[in-house]
Amino acid sequence: VRAFGQVFSSRGMHAPGVKGAVSIQPAVSVCPVKVISTGITCCLPNNGKISMGFKSSVEHGLYILRGSIIPGVAAKNGLTCADCELLREALLHFPDNDCSSSRPAGSIEVRRLYWWEHPGKLGVCPPAIVFSSVIAEPLRSRPASFADYEITNAEIPGVKLSIFENDT
């Protein structure tokens, strides 16, 4: 609740929600991806029911996920620096133990995390400037690995940048 907030719903009661200090946007691919759909069938008898489904996967993709922490809301909710460090570790390692048939172990990895810290609660610049300071450019027309991209970041005066690598 301290990080992501909470909407309280109770029948017949009005309870105010808790605004989340942490905002995580959906990840977006740098280049178009090729989606592969695979049919799955069940070999066991199923009382005449259809037992076929599909799973979808992506052949290769480099995705950028953006997020931010609102300092004023964080202070109000009691979000601490230690909580932020746990969030950073969670972002670096979230796919490590989350495998499935469409996401086999090791098929998704976080390669790099850019973590900015502004001095003070108001910050030096809006999040859009921070987000646009990192640019991922494909080096080939059809990238097939992380090495097929050039990733650069522009310095933002007054904002501390830490880069965390997951070299696998």
What do the PLM-derived regions correspond to, one by one?
Residues 1-168:
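RNA-binding basic/glycine-rich loop and surface signature characteristic of RAMP-family CRISPR effectors
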